[in-house]
Amino acid sequence: MGTQGKVIKCKAAIAWKTGSPLCIEEIEVSPPKACEVRIQVIATCVCPTDINATDPKKKALFPVVLGHECAGIVESVGPGVTNFKPGDKVIPFFAPQCKRCKLCLSPLTNLCGKLRNFKYPTIDQELMEDRTSRFTCKGRSIYHFMGVSSFSQYTVVSEANLARVDDEANLERVCLIGCGFSSGYGAAINTAKVTPSSTCAVFGLGCVGLSAIIGCKIAGASRIIAIDINGEKFPKAKALGATDCLNPRELDKPVQDVITELTAGGVDYSLDCAGTAQTLKAAVDCTVLGWGSCTVVGAKVDKMTIPTVDVILGRSINGTFFGGWKSVDSVPNLVSDYKNKKFDLDLLVTHALPFESINDAIDLMKEGKSIRTILTF
């Protein structure tokens, strides 16, 4: 391509400061350096993590190009890159896999040593590995976000944060595999390890929670209880496999008590995809004593407490990062599974908008009116 080795000028949505709408700007994207790949973003989505990053309580650095769920096409590669070439369809992701570090070499985790700040993984990777940015706007250096920065027509990522996918992949659907779908689906399949004929409770029915329901159903769960304070999400949850839907605001007792009664003692597996203090407590309390397992998929609070006796009596709590998938190895397989109709991503997409309407997409999510909005350039 004629742009290889050159600075590219393109559109991007920049968060200049906390709490303000994103601004569509013209930015300059530098060529990739060693072990980096420059991508033309074809489709991207808004995830709650992008919105939460602008919260003043978070530690995000500004100005920043947000976005971390997308799919695109390789425009050019930096020195030393041999696994990608211009024209490849790719999915970047926030969970790197360098395949060299102690963590990557262990079968026990999907974490990678390239993450520098494990305490705040969602705001890590704000610069490239040489600690510089590939983005500039109006003479200012702009921070990256979670190693992806998909709210730009072009972005630069580490090859450890990228997977080549099927040439026939529908990028406007498989972009969900870059975060939301993989996180929820994998939480059920890989982390909770839901078993056939088991009972499950899924808290929070956004993209991650609905994807967890898909995972529970594919794993063979006999009963899947979906919980959310927005009842408008229940029809979609049932279409994806939920057998029961509960709105805690419409119950006369705590939702965990209702779930315990419905399942004669508690569910085998709970997955908290909402991450509030209330849902974390309920997700633990609704599991059966003896073997009940709670998987924490997302957390909006820094700490959670659990009575010691719960642990002694057999309840367990697991955390999951990117659904437990080793990203570079697993993402191509997930794309193939979608192509082979093992699961359907279409029900997770509620809106499609031009990239310039990104703030409308954010409003739709804040108002609980969308699951995923696909933005295209």
Curated annotation (Swiss-Prot):
This is All-trans-retinol dehydrogenase [NAD(+)] ADH4. Zn(2+) 2 binds at C98, C101, C104, C112. Belongs to the zinc-containing alcohol dehydrogenase family. Class-II subfamily. GO terms for biological process: alcohol catabolic process; aldehyde metabolic process; ethanol metabolic process; fatty acid omega-oxidation; quinone metabolic process; retinol metabolic process. Liver specific. InterPro entries: ADH-like_C, ADH-like_N, ADH_Zn_CS, GroES-like_sf, NAD(P)-bd_dom_sf. NAD(+) binds at residues 49, 204-209, 228, 233, 297-299, 320-322, 372. Keywords: Cytoplasm, Lipid metabolism, Metal-binding, NAD, Oxidoreductase, Zinc. Pfam families: ADH_N (PF08240), ADH_zinc_N (PF00107). PANTHER family: ALCOHOL DEHYDROGENASE, ALL-TRANS-RETINOL DEHYDROGENASE [NAD(+)] ADH4. Its EC number is 1.1.1.105. Its cofactor is Zn(2+). Oxidation of 20-HETE is inhibited by low concentrations of N-heptylformamide. Oxidation of 20-HETE is a decreased by 55-65% by either all-trans-retinol or all-trans-retinoic acid. Strongly inhibited by omega-hydroxy fatty acids. One of its GO terms (cellular component) is cytosol. Its main location: cytoplasm. It comes from the Eukaryota.
